[in-house]
Amino acid sequence: MRQSREELIKRGVLKEIFDKDGELSIPNEEGALENGQPLGSGQVLSSSQVSLPALAELESGSAPGEPCSYEVLPTTEITDGTVSEESPTSNESGVLLSQDPTAKPVLLLPPKKSAAFPGDHEDTPVKQLSLLKQPPALPPKPIARIASHLTDPGAPVKLPCMPVKLSPPLPPKKVMICMPLGGPDLSSLSSYSTQKSSQQPLTQHHHTVLPSQLAAHQHQLQYGSHSQHLPSGSSTLPIHPSGCRMIEELNKTLAMTMQRLESSGLHTGDNVTKTGPGGLPDMRQVPTVVIECDDNKENVPHEADYEDSSCLYPRQEEEEEEDEDEDNSLFTSSLAMKVCRKDSLAIKLSNRPSKRELEEKNILPMQTDEERLELRQQIGTKLTRRLSQRPTAEELEQRNILKPRNEQEEQEEKREIKRRLTRKLSQRPTVEELRERKILIRFSDYVEVADAQDYDRRADKPWTRLTAADKAAIRKELNEFKSSEMEVHELSRHLTRFHRP
């Protein structure tokens, strides 16, 4: 069931924008290519050529039951000129879905120079343009066949959709779709894609977009303004990003989603059978979005990376399980660790080689007793040589390190020292002088001080000449004196010391 253009415009799928004078204008992009060749600067397509009859031919050319295909304008319209339409909000070119849910996306070449022509029909929808690009360095793709058909001014050329497989992904079609910031809102696009997928009878060649992927595309449309890709109901086209950093991130996410889909069992082969809303099994394929950057193609991963990624994740899970087992085994007590350390040290010490083993392995040199004696003699000769090199006393005297000595000078030095000492002793003060100066304050008063004659104490030693009998008589006399004549207190008599007889 087709819907009219007015209903689609009301729903927000199509936009109809007019200038003040009723003219339709589209922002142009410089360097527009037609299969790699630049367009002429004077080629302009009038609005009368892109009118309701041309659109009717495009709609009638594709039946709803036919396989998915891309439709290109006839060469008469392409070579004569291009349609230009300018939006009051933004000058960026965008993607506009076709006016019919069963119609196929129409790919229009962007013009080289912007031109505005009065539109005869006010109800003509805004056909915003996309770019067909084919770099010469890459191998020929299915879109490369457009060049041969564009020369024929016949019916519009149809390109069948290539079935997309998950591993390895097919080489991408060189079609770039630029999405403006102020383009159609996401809700209208999602509703359009779901409506088209539910209304069309799907065949093997059709592949729709899953709701999870549609949500992912909406998230990328919200947060990634430079790298934006729009999933349509019949095909998914690669997008040309402005930066190569986004390419690497999107390729990583694609590889992860492919692996998760394979591991979850959603894909048993190239196609997946699911029951539709009417109970009929519909064959669907999850499309693969491959993004290529022509400025820097070295960052794009190879197809072998996608094939090898399937065998990486089970190995990583096994390694993680082994690491967890090792971590659990290491949770032992500190006492056990100490015991292990002591045991390991004891084992290492017991395994130390002996001196003989080291000598056999030539680690330690073999030494006999004679060799040891020779080494000691060599060390002794070195020491004696060093000691013999010490300077003599005469050399030290010559260097004024040692002073020369004479016997007469030494005796005179000794005499001078004695004179100093006697002078100091003769100048000592008496006890009375010390009391007057209050130096001997603690000196006891009951001590009687008597002047004695000066004599040499060392000269007179009578006790050295006493015999044993004289000593015995002296001891006997002392004992008798202490026992009879000396006054002793009765309580301290036992403390009296008597000499042995």
Curated annotation (Swiss-Prot):
Gene3D superfamilies: 6.10.140.1750, 6.10.140.2130. Pfam families: RPEL (PF02755). Expressed in the gizzard, and in neurons from central and peripheral nervous systems. This is Phosphatase and actin regulator 1. Keywords: Actin-binding, Cytoplasm, Nucleus, Protein phosphatase inhibitor, Repeat, Synapse. InterPro entries: RPEL_repeat (IPR004018). One of its GO terms (molecular function) is protein phosphatase inhibitor activity. The keyword Repeat applies. RPEL repeats lie at residues 1-18, 343-368, 381-406, 419-444. Residues 317-328 have a biased composition (Acidic residues). Residues 295-304, 392-415 have a biased composition (Basic and acidic residues). Belongs to the phosphatase and actin regulator family. Disulfide bonds: none annotated. Its main location: cytoplasm. The keyword Nucleotide-binding does not apply. Interacts (via RPEL repeats) with ACTA1. The gene is PHACTR1. It comes from Gallus gallus (Chicken). It is found in: Cytoplasm; Synapse; Nucleus. PANTHER family: PHOSPHATASE AND ACTIN REGULATOR 1 (PTHR12751:SF6), PHOSPHATASE AND ACTIN REGULATOR PHACTR (PTHR12751).
